[in-house]
Regions:
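Rossmann-fold NAD(P)-binding glycine/threonine-rich loop
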Residues: 2-3, 10-32
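Loop/helix-junction capping segments adjacent to catalytic residues or to phosphate/diphosphate-binding pockets
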Residues: 9, 16-17, 41, 109, ...
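General beta-strand structural signal in soluble alpha/beta enzymes
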Residues: 9-10, 33-37, 58-62, 118-120, ...
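Aromatic/hydrophobic pocket-lining residues that form π-stacking "cages" and hydrophobic walls in ligand
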Residues: 22, 47, 105
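C-terminal catalytic/substrate-binding lobe primarily of soluble NAD(P)-dependent oxidoreductases
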Residues: 80-300
Length: 300
């Protein structure tokens, strides 16, 4: 950024830790900082923009998750499955323990300014055909406390979805004619994200259009580290998808005193934390590394 170069971030973990600072720095330097196309956050953002552009109110935006949740998963416990999939066991562990979904939906939340419904989100089990019955407000039989939320569902992976509504009679009539349902809630679903195949689109967007695909516009959500096992003084925290921690998405307003997942790799444990509990900052001695220094700048 300081050299006047556009930055297309393939590491979403970095975005949910210091992305707001990077976006601000890029704006000052007249360059683009963006999460790269290809993964669910940008795919969701594109579907969100599409939904709004054609006149809908977005009730819920999110992604499908296909791996059963196991917040105790480690590279060791998943080694054989990872080898079968030709994957890095640590990466697979970050999917199975839920960290990756929490990270991706936090990036989306901060990028579009739409909050999470609650700590950890709802994550109902749902077929695509039932998304517009599940991810809607409780008052209409769904799981959301309120409309306008970021969430996810077990089942409709690897796609992304936008649950929308409208009071426009012309759109309602046309949606019925197009066999999209009688409303009041409709599901717009994109059944894929194409990873590195899509990533080059980010280059064109940055260089030709001078636009980001997704960047933080606010900081309303945070991924907090939780203990994957009992942590004791003297332990050292390893990285995302490791043996000691996993991530849970929080409304930022509920994170006082808690340690963001992206800051704790290499931290020394100085206070006990029970398995499954959020990790307090006071229980860690954070490393004096670049990511923590940049986060301090973001906080200030």
């Amino acid at each position: 950024i300081d050299a006047g170069k556009h930055i297309l971030m393939l590491n979403v973990e970095t975005d949910i830790t210091i992305g707001l600072y990077l976006a601000q720095q890029a704006k000052e330097k007249g360059v683009v900082y963006s999460v790269a196309n290809g993964d669910e956050p940008v795919a969701c953002k594109e579907l969100y923009d599409f939904s709004v552009d054609i006149g809908f109110e977005v009730v819920c935006i999110g992604k499908g998750k296909n791996n059963p949740l196991d917040q105790t998963a480690t590279p060791e416990s998943l080694h054989d499955r990872a080898m079968q999939k030709n994957m890095n066991p640590k990466m697979l562990a970050s999917f199975v323990d839920g960290s990756k979904t929490m990270i991706e939906m936090t990036a989306l939340s901060n990028g579009i300014g739409m909050p999470l419904d609650k700590v950890g989100m709802n994550g109902p089990v749902s077929e695509v055909s039932d998304l517009n019955r599940n991810l809607i407000p409780e008052s209409d039989g769904g799981v959301l406390k309120e409309s306008g939320r970021v969430d996810f569902a077990f089942g409709p992976a690897p796609g992304v979805f936008s649950i929308v509504t409208t009071d426009n009679p012309t759109i309602i009539e046309e949606m019925a004619y197009l066999s999209m349902g009688e409303g009041p809630y409709y599901t717009l679903y994109r059944p894929y994200h194409l990873a590195s195949v899509e990533a080059p689109r980010s280059v064109g967007m940055a260089i030709i259009n001078n636009e980001p695909g997704l960047q933080p516009t606010t900081w309303i959500s945070e991924v907090i580290g939780h203990a994957k096992k009992d942590l004791k003084p003297g332990d050292q925290i390893d990285g995302i998808g490791g043996f000691s921690s996993y991530g849970v998405a929080y409304p930022y307003s509920e994170t006082d005193g808690l340690a963001p997942l992206g800051l704790i790799e290499g931290a020394k444990v100085v206070g006990e934390v029970k398995q499954g509990e959020p990790i307090p900052r006071a229980s860690l001695e954070l490393p004096d590394n670049l990511i923590n220094k940049l986060r301090n700048k973001q906080n200030n």
